[in-house]
Amino acid sequence: MKYREIILNIPKEIAEDFTTFLDEIGVAGYYEILFDREVPRAPHEEIISDDTKFRVYLAQEDNENETKILIYLKANAGEVFFSESRWIETKEYEEAYKEFYKPFIVGSYRVIPTWEKDTALGTTPEGIFPLFINPGLAFGTGHHETTRLVLGRMGNLSLSGKKVVDVGTGSGILSVAAAKSGASPILAVDVDPNSVRSASFNRDENDISSEVLAVEEGGFDHEKIQGQTWDLLIANITFAVLKANIQKIVSIKTDHFLFSGVITERLEEFLELLKNEVGGEGVFFQEDTGWELIEWKRKG
């Protein structure tokens, strides 16, 4: 089977809305390329570019979505975007992201692609947890600012023996990190079946049992999420999805939340939403190139 690969350079400020749009029209897959270096950007470093690069994949029989994408970008980015496209085979589609995915350290973790497991493991510093990840077509390489923000904060939390739920798990990287830090049991859920398969694969690659880390299809209204009590809820999900699910979030039995996926322009609106609907207060905040991490505690 062939796929249409569209390579896009678009303004960073429309990236969140663009990913929401791609989800709505139902493309075969996409990912955002941010950087591919070993050492994360230091806080004092300047942002290299105001643009971000996407690779979007369309199934061979999909004759409409490329036009929809270009119309969307014309309307929202004007002339400030670049695109090119080509036909690729299934193997290229599944392997394309490997070109941009290298081992790197964030906080207490070193994210290692599964195909570099044997060579990179021996060079992992002592005291750093290795996370073996093959993102496939699921979100969560660890390169995205939102994922790095959560990983960085998780390394400063005491997770041993804690009961954790990860909503919108993507590749499962955050759940794997929680397990490596001693959390158990963990429930990772995602509405995308590809993500469920990817997260399950990565769990197994890290020799984590299904008793410690269960991966299931679902969202905030998942029966197990709503029916149990949790020490920590992790949600690396866009503001639009968080806002749409706020009442489901309110009903989850936990007093401790880690949210990411919120852009700086929406931060105040999101904090007001949490204050009015969830209650409690923010206890830790961090920003990375226009993306926000919010650690929130509800008063028990």
UniProtKB/Swiss-Prot annotation:
Give the CC-aspect GO terms. cytoplasm
For the ligand (S-adenosyl-L-methionine), the binding residues are T147, G168, D190, N236
The main location class comes to cytoplasm
Q: Where, subcellularly, is it found?
A: Cytoplasm
Which biological processes are named by the entry's GO terms? Answer: methylation
Supply the enzyme class, top level.
Answer: transferase
A single GO molecular function term of this UniProt record: protein-lysine N-methyltransferase activity
Q: Which InterPro entries match?
A: Ribosomal_L11_MeTrfase_PrmA, Ribosomal_PrmA_MeTrfase, SAM-dependent_MTases_sf
Annotated keywords: Cytoplasm, Methyltransferase, S-adenosyl-L-methionine, Transferase
Q: Does the keyword Iron apply?
A: no
Query: What reaction(s) does this enzyme catalyze?
Result: L-lysyl-[protein] + 3 S-adenosyl-L-methionine = N(6),N(6),N(6)-trimethyl-L-lysyl-[protein] + 3 S-adenosyl-L-homocysteine + 3 H(+)
Q: What's the Enzyme Commission number for this chain? A: 2.1.1.-
Organism superkingdom:
Bacteria
Family the entry assigns: Belongs to the methyltransferase superfamily. PrmA family.
Q: What does this protein do?
A: Methylates ribosomal protein L11.
Record's protein name:
Ribosomal protein L11 methyltransferase
